[in-house]
Amino acid sequence: MRASELFSPTLREVPAEAEVVSHQLLLRAGFIRRAAAGVYTYLPLAMRVIKKIEQIVREEMDRQGGQELLMPIIQPAEIWQESGRWDVYGPELFRLKDRHDRDFALGPTHEEIITVLVRGEVSSYKQLPLLLYQIQNKYRDERRPRFGLMRGREFIMKDLYSFDRDEEGLNVSYMKMYEAYTRVFQRCGLHFRPVEADSGAIGGSDTHEFMVLAESGEATVLYCDGNGCDYAANVEKAALPFKERRTEEEMRPVAARETPGCRSVEEVCGFLGVPARKIIKTLIYRTEKEVLAALVRGDRDVNEVKLLNASGALRLELAGADTVKSITGASVGYAGPVGLKGVRIIADPEAAAAVNAVTGANRDDTHLINVNPGRDFKIDLVADIRMVQAGEPCPRCGAGLKEAKGIEVGQIFKLGDKYSRALGASYLDEKGQSRPVIMGCYGIGITRTMAAAIEQNHDRDGIIWPASIAPFHVVVIPVNVKDGGQYAMAEEVYSRLWAAGIEAVLDDRTERAGVKFKDADLIGYPLRITIGAKAVEEKLVEIRIRKNGETVFVPMNELEEKVEDMLKEL
């Protein structure tokens, strides 16, 4: 490819709407252009990266026995209603009607449609196990699309579905995909960590996310690296090793104290002279069927994912000021569990074990002191519903947990019979008994992986692509394209590289060398070969490594071998 022919419109200024580095650089380097909020056109450079990621994914899926197919983007509402997810999925599901007023959805995932396919085609244990996958556009109507390709409304994803006879078979398929994902992201040149996670709207039991570690990541990962321990979890899933026990402190009589204008934990602590750990925070939530009061210690935060799972609800949201007032009789900041009626109380173990705690009094400008769970109010459910923090003990080995930011690029799920039972996908076993097919699903965000690679591999000058997914491996730059000797040598280098299977761009533009160098750094070619007067005279090419800025001089007769060796290290 010649740079004069390459459609790669670069920008010198950072677009105002681009918040994160990957979004800025993908726009500036001419990889993508915005079509609408969360919707992008992928230009030729981006497509080369995407195709390389897809090829790595295909090779690893095929290695495990996966078979590629392609399912429709437009899915009939009936199968979503049959699975129970039509109403559960919420506003993120793109819904549409055809001219006959029939309901459809744009697929955010394909569990329903793949299960219906298998329901109609698989009937015997002899047809299992089965691994089917696709690479397909997905659609989610994000409330606030942001961060470019990180959180868009249209994106490219690989989703594989496993179908097994039993849980034992599912475990085998799950580990196959765990290993395959590890190889995919290793081959993409990414620094990542598999972490325990919550299954969310997909459902099922065990699940792992694959997180690319980057400061710009939206997710928080808690991990342990002590004593050879490899525990890691999304903060939404991170567990605690033990439950708090009550202290031997003697219970004192409950009493009310005026706390004018003290709504926050910090204000109450300062006014009453108590530490935050002596306060029980009461937060009011609404679900689709009831009102909940979530209790955590004053120095803790509610983990809404854990609370949702503990409650058994489908949806959960923090109650507004009007709801809090109608339920408690007080403004936000003064809610408490004592005397609370018509509300299910779910308490974290620390809050349940509190002695002589401070709570809201369900009366404005008033708090209660010496409140004791069990004596002064009844807890309906004790469950781990709080956020775990860095420094707290690892649930496996007890060492202090550390914190990192991550970008989720893949997730694997054990679905069990969640969809097969709902949609009637069954098979006959060796004894002729009908059994539900046991399923797993496994997703990789292709376009998100491209963005995550940039978040992890960039500097102030531009992108630093890992060689395995770079749009081109090498850019060849003649310093003066009007110099016949330099241009002829650049053409020779360019032709020899392609003949050796090395993807190269010849920058044949009449721009100044400095402009070409800046564009090369911005786009992120792993290697830059410069052809100047000295190169022509000495038959020696200058090769600059984008990753570390090192420059080496290579004789022309060693060109292909040296370039191949250098790319292997990148």
UniProtKB/Swiss-Prot annotation:
Enzyme Commission identifier(s): 6.1.1.15
PROSITE patterns found in the cross-reference section: AA_TRNA_LIGASE_II
UniProt keyword terms in alphabetical order: Aminoacyl-tRNA synthetase, ATP-binding, Cytoplasm, Ligase, Nucleotide-binding, Protein biosynthesis
GO BP term (any one): prolyl-tRNA aminoacylation
Gene Ontology MF: a single term: catalytic activity, acting on a protein
Cited InterPro entries: aa-tRNA-synt_IIb, aa-tRNA-synth_II, aa-tRNA-synth_II/BPL/LPL, Anticodon-bd, Anticodon-bd_dom_sf, Pro-tRNA-ligase_IIa, Pro-tRNA-synth_IIa_bac-type, Pro-tRNA-Synthase_IIa_type1
Cystine pairs: none
Catalysed reactions listed for this entry: tRNA(Pro) + L-proline + ATP = L-prolyl-tRNA(Pro) + AMP + diphosphate
Primary site of residence: cytoplasm
GO cellular component: cytosol
Coiled-coil spans in chain: none
Compartment(s) of residence: Cytoplasm
Record function comment: Catalyzes the attachment of proline to tRNA(Pro) in a two-step reaction: proline is first activated by ATP to form Pro-AMP and then transferred to the acceptor end of tRNA(Pro). As ProRS can inadvertently accommodate and process non-cognate amino acids such as alanine and cysteine, to avoid such errors it has two additional distinct editing activities against alanine. One activity is designated as 'pretransfer' editing and involves the tRNA(Pro)-independent hydrolysis of activated Ala-AMP.
Subunit structure as annotated in this protein's UniProt entry: Homodimer.
Domain notes: Consists of three domains: the N-terminal catalytic domain, the editing domain and the C-terminal anticodon-binding domain.
Family designation: Belongs to the class-II aminoacyl-tRNA synthetase family. ProS type 1 subfamily.
Protein name: Proline--tRNA ligase
Species annotation: Pelotomaculum thermopropionicum (strain DSM 13744 / JCM 10971 / SI)
